[in-house]
């Protein structure tokens, strides 16, 4: 997520297009890798501590990638709030393994609209 997310941000023309690109990437990943999301949640404690530390570092960097764009878009946001917004958006998008009610094309559009709306950039 971090590598491609960084590429998307680097290719974007400003924070709002960067956030839209991040949303699109995360939605795409979540729809294509539902099982991975479930396994990570379920088997987290089975990972050795060193692996958990590495994953947490990558996750923090990914959150901060989003938070930086949110703060560029709205300089009044403090870092803690921007991180909380990113986490809340991830929760929305990562709910896909538990929602098989819509075909992927409709789910993609729904998640995109909801995620962008939650970030205030709809």
Segments the model singles out, each with a brief description of its role:
Residues 15, 19, 51, 78-82, ...:
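Residue-level recognition of alpha-helical structural elements
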Residues 29-32, 36, 68, 79, ...:
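Amphipathic C-terminal alpha-helical segment
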Residues 5, 9, 48, 74, ...:
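Short amphipathic alpha-helical interaction patches enriched in hydrophobic/aromatic residues
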């Amino acid at each position: 997520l971090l590598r491609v997310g960084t590429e998307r941000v680097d290719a974007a023309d400003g924070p709002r297009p960067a956030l839209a690109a991040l949303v699109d990437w995360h939605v795409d990943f979540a729809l294509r890798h539902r099982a991975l999301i479930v396994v990570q949640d379920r088997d987290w404690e089975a990972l050795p501590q060193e692996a958990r530390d590495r994953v947490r570092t990558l996750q923090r960097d990914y959150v901060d990638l989003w938070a930086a764009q949110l703060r560029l878009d709205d300089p009044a946001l403090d870092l803690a709030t921007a991180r909380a917004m990113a986490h809340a958006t991830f929760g929305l998008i990562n709910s896909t393994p538990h929602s098989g009610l819509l075909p992927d094309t409709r789910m993609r559009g729904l998640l995109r609209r909801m995620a962008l709306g939650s970030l205030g950039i709809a």
